[in-house]
């Protein structure tokens, strides 16, 4: 009698709970990445009150990126070994506590420290480890499922900064952080208890030496190439994400108008991530990635030369679609090229270089402003 592969999925129908996981991780990543994107809205009020430079304040974004990158790799090892059952709960509590403490900050050391904690024990937990989890719930059109899940980050980076801008204008930056902390606790904590590990990854933990993989390159070679690609793509995308709102307000736009442009950029990114994942199902993850990466590179060049608000909205739509599609395609490339039991580590390692690129781009953008005054 032949022995069946323990990792084989015995039904062509994807588990219904996989779609519940898509919804859960969509919302958790929306909250996690939303606070990351909202730094651009808090940048000028904090710099004005504490007399910080743009470069110093922009390092708050770098603090999240750095801690998410470093701790994300560690959480990837934990996820591949023990699963992600409690990742959502821990992240919900830490994100809430960090935002609350940011409302009480009195120095730039506090600012960096609380955002570092937010990234290390909040954003890092609901990022790559949970994306790897969701990726293996699906056998039919995994790109679409991954794209919808990844769209949560773009949605959050659109709505959270916009709401933060309204709260800052109405009540001040301290109250805005406080309101965000309360909202995160109410929304994220119940969802955290719904996180479950995918059946494929559970089998991979039970049978680590018997995992199907067809991609010709070694997993280490795959990681080197993907990490290099992600480093440069994220360096490019982080500059408008962090500095678009200050750029527009410096040009005479109101804070609400500037944040609405960022919101349009991120909401178009929701569609970009979904269709980017679907495109990966149709033409393959790697060709889809190349197409989306080319798009973001072309569109980002036009932001400094565009002043008309309507034209800015149009540019935001195109850039948001392209840059967000990059993330879905990278996740699909990783899923295609590595084994299930290595997926969380692989996605976390590529994310490490992604966050490094985003942190570098955010700081360099602020530094160039300080050097040139625009």
Describe the role of every protein-language-model region.
Residues 157, 337-374:
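A late C-terminal transmembrane helix in Major Facilitator Superfamily
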Residues 46, 124-138, 325-338:
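Intracellular juxtamembrane helix-capping segments at the cytosolic ends
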Residues 93-106, 295-307:
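C-terminal ends and interior cores of transmembrane alpha-helices
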Residues 39-44, 219-278:
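Extracytoplasmic gate region of multi-pass secondary transporters
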């Amino acid at each position: 009698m032949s022995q069946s592969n323990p990792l084989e999925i015995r039904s062509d129908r994807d588990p219904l709970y996989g779609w519940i996981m898509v919804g859960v991780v969509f919302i958790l990543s929306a909250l996690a990445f939303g606070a990351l994107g909202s730094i651009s809205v808090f940048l000028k009020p904090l710099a004005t009150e504490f007399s910080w430079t743009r470069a110093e304040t922009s390092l708050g974004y770098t603090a999240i990126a750095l801690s998410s990158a470093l701790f994300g790799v560690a959480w990837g090892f934990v996820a591949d070994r023990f699963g992600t059952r409690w990742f959502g709960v821990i992240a919900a509590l830490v994100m809430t506590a960090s935002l609350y403490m940011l409302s009480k900050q009195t120095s730039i050391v506090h600012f960096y420290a609380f955002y570092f904690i937010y990234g290390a024990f909040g954003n890092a937990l609901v990022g790559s480890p949970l994306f790897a989890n969701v990726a293996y719930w699906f056998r039919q059109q995994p790109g679409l499922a991954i794209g919808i899940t990844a769209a949560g980050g773009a949605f959050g980076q659109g709505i959270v900064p916009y709401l933060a801008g309204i709260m800052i204008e109405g009540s001040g930056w301290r109250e805005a952080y406080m309101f965000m902390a309360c909202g995160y606790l109410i929304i994220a904590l119940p969802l955290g208890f719904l996180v479950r590990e995918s059946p494929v990854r559970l089998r991979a933990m039970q049978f680590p030496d018997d995992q199907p993989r067809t991609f010709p390159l070694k997993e280490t070679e795959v990681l080197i190439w993907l990490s290099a690609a992600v480093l440069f793509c994220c360096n490019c995308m982080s500059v408008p994400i962090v500095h678009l709102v200050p750029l527009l307000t410096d040009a005479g736009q109101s804070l609400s108008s500037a944040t609405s442009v960022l919101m349009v950029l991120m909401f178009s990114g929701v569609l970009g991530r979904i269709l980017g994942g679907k495109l990966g199902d149709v033409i393959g993850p790697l060709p889809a990635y190349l197409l989306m990466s080319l798009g973001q590179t072309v569109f980002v060049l036009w932001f400094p030369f565009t002043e008309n608000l309507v034209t800015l909205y149009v540019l935001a739509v195109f850039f948001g679609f392209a840059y967000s599609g990059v993330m879905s395609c990278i996740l699909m490339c990783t899923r295609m090229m590595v084994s299930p039991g290595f997926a969380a580590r692989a996605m976390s390692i590529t994310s490490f270089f992604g966050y490094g690129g985003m942190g570098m781009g955010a700081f360099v953008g602020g530094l160039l402003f300080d050097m040139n005054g625009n």
